[in-house]
């Protein structure tokens, strides 16, 4: 896995040399809004940081097509709280990744908007940290093992809008192609039943979910 970024960089350098086009380096910094698909909660409520460096290679003489490679630090996770009558919980976890996105870009004829799509490889550098607490109402996750898998392969959709000269506003969506945590067990309330003495008692069932990172990033890019 450690040779993947080097191989991608070599491909970009080869394309650049053959086309004799410029490489535009850039810095980027922004925030992520993320959730974990499969944790039984909804909403992009976990806020984290994303930032790093990258390079955009022009693949055509009119600069309409390009390819970019980035090296980023990104935070993802999930956060939600409730103290209603039926749901009593707090859920706040965050994971740190080093990621290498590779995107193909198309630029509009006026040069003000750049759209991209591609893939990203993320390496988990810090396991999810935070707190998970649930009262036994309706659903309860197994918190004995919060370990996530070390690799995250994501699909990426990207849009950049020029603000002024080399300054751009970037919106990016990413979703895991493979699970980052498998078979997370949840107990959930499944109604009532009668025990051997005829008393009505709660009935609980279990389910297991595979989990996927789902995030939206809002970034500023300064391109040289």
Region spans (language model):
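Structural signature of outer-membrane beta-barrel domains
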Residues: 32-36, 74-78, 122-126, 174-180
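Outer-membrane beta-barrel translocator domains and adjoining extracellular loop/strand segments
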Residues: 37-43, 79-86, 127-136, 181-188
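Short glycine/proline- and aromatic-enriched beta-strand/turn motifs that initiate or cap beta-hairpins
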Residues: 20-57, 133, 215, 219-224
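Residues that define the transmembrane beta-barrel architecture of outer-membrane proteins
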Residues: 21-23, 45-49, 94-98, 151-155, ...
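Repeated loop/turn-to-beta-strand initiation elements of outer-membrane beta-barrel proteins
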Residues: 63-67, 111-113, 165-171
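Residues on the lipid-exposed face of transmembrane beta-strands in outer-membrane beta-barrel proteins
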Residues: 27-31, 51-57, 71-73, 100-106, ...
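Predominantly the C-terminal beta-signal and adjacent terminal strand-loop region
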Residues: 144-147, 152-224
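Extracellular loop and loop/strand-boundary signature of outer-membrane beta-barrel proteins
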Residues: 37-42, 85-91, 140-145, 203-208
């Amino acid at each position: 896995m450690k040779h993947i970024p080097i191989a991608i960089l070599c491909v970009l350098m080869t394309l650049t040399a053959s086309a004799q086009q410029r490489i535009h380096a850039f810095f980027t910094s922004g925030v992520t809004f993320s959730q974990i698909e499969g944790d039984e909660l909804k909403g992009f409520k976990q806020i984290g940081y994303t930032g790093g460096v990258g390079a955009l290679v022009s693949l055509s003489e009119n600069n309409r097509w390009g390819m970019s490679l980035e090296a980023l630090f990104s935070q993802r996770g999930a956060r939600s709280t409730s103290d209603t009558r039926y749901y009593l919980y707090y859920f706040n976890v965050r994971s740190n990744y080093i990621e290498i996105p590779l995107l193909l870009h198309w630029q509009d004829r006026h040069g003000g908007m750049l759209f991209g799509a591609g893939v990203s490889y993320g390496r988990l550098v810090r396991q999810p940290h935070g707190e998970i607490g649930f009262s036994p109402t309706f659903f309860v996750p197994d918190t004995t093992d919060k370990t996530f898998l070390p690799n995250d392969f994501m699909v990426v959709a990207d849009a950049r809008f020029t603000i002024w000269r080399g300054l751009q506003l970037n919106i990016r969506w990413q979703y895991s192609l493979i699970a980052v945590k498998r078979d997370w067990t949840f107990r959930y309330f499944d109604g009532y039943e009668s025990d051997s003495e005829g008393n009505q008692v709660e009935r609980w069932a279990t389910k297991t979910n595979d989990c996927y990172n789902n995030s939206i990033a809002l970034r500023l890019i300064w391109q040289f």
